[in-house]
């Protein structure tokens, strides 16, 4: 009879412990319900990138001296620099400059070590295409400045600094973002 009583006591203690664990996990879940949403509606809302963001590379053809430093510091020898030696002036003349963004790892070494600052990183990150050969940008495509996300009136920009206000009087299933 005595082992049966201790068995019931152990069962009761285990039941109380399980109920406490369930209650703790439920309280954690409820504490997360008060947080603001983290996700954004991507095509219509875009986060503003930071200053140090490494996006598509912008190239200025007139500043380049064809020194090929960018090729030497690139971990995968990616930039293709075609030049010829102009015998009259004894200088290199740049003919073609291209980067394949399908292979580029966006490390930023080429931008950092360029002596003439003809390379710079932009905030453009939407480089997806259906054909991988379209990711090979020549000096004309690299020279185009991307449209800034801030200047595009069709896109609502959001930052991590401004909190999004959520209507409190609506039920949880139909929360809407208010300005």
From Swiss-Prot:
Gene Ontology BP terms: photosynthesis, light reaction
Family: Belongs to the complex I 23 kDa subunit family.
Signal peptide from the UniProt entry: none
Keywords, in A-Z order: 4Fe-4S, Chloroplast, Iron, Iron-sulfur, Membrane, Metal-binding, NAD, NADP, Plastid, Plastoquinone, Quinone, Repeat, Thylakoid, Translocase
Binding site for [4Fe-4S] cluster 2: 74, 104, 107, 110
Location relative to the cell: Plastid, Chloroplast thylakoid membrane
SUBUNIT field: NDH is composed of at least 16 different subunits, 5 of which are encoded in the nucleus.
Superkingdom in the source lineage: Eukaryota
GO molecular function, one term: 4 iron, 4 sulfur cluster binding
Function: NDH shuttles electrons from NAD(P)H:plastoquinone, via FMN and iron-sulfur (Fe-S) centers, to quinones in the photosynthetic chain and possibly in a chloroplast respiratory chain. The immediate electron acceptor for the enzyme in this species is believed to be plastoquinone. Couples the redox reaction to proton translocation, and thus conserves the redox energy in a proton gradient.
EC number: 7.1.1.-
Pfam families in alphabetical order: Fer4_10
Membrane topology: Peripheral membrane protein
Family matches, as HAMAP family: NDH1_NuoI (MF_01351)
Cofactors demanded by this protein: [4Fe-4S] cluster
Primary location group: plastid
Cofactor remark from the record: Binds 2 [4Fe-4S] clusters per subunit.
Catalytic activity: a plastoquinone + NADH + (n+1) H(+)(in) = a plastoquinol + NAD(+) + n H(+)(out); a plastoquinone + NADPH + (n+1) H(+)(in) = a plastoquinol + NADP(+) + n H(+)(out)
Enzyme class name: translocase
Residues involved in [4Fe-4S] cluster 1 binding: 64, 67, 70, 114
Name the record gives this protein: NAD(P)H-quinone oxidoreductase subunit I, chloroplastic
InterPro entries named among the record's database cross-references: 4Fe4S_Fe-S-bd, 4Fe4S_Fe_S_CS, NADH_quinone_OxRdtase_chainI, NDHI
Residue span(s) of domain 4Fe-4S ferredoxin-type: 55-84, 95-124
GO CC term, one of those recorded: chloroplast thylakoid membrane
């Amino acid at each position: 009879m005595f082992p049966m009583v201790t068995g019931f006591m152990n069962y009761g203690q285990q039941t109380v412990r399980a109920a406490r664990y369930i209650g703790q996990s439920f309280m954690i879940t409820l504490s997360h319900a008060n947080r603001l949403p983290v996700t954004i509606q991507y095509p219509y809302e875009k986060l503003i990138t930071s200053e140090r963001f490494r996006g598509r590379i912008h190239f200025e053809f007139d500043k380049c001296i064809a020194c090929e430093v960018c090729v030497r510091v690139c971990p995968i020898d990616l930039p293709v620099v075609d030049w010829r030696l102009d015998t009259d002036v004894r200088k290199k003349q740049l003919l073609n400059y291209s980067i394949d963004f399908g292979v580029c790892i966006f490390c930023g070494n080429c931008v950092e070590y360029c002596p003439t600052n003809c390379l710079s990183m932009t905030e453009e990150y939407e480089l997806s295409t259906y054909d991988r050969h379209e990711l090979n940008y020549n000096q004309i495509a690299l020279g185009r400045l991307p449209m800034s996300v801030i200047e595009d009136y069709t896109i609502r920009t959001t930052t991590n600094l401004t909190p999004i206000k959520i209507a409190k009087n609506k039920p949880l299933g139909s929360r809407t973002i208010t300005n």
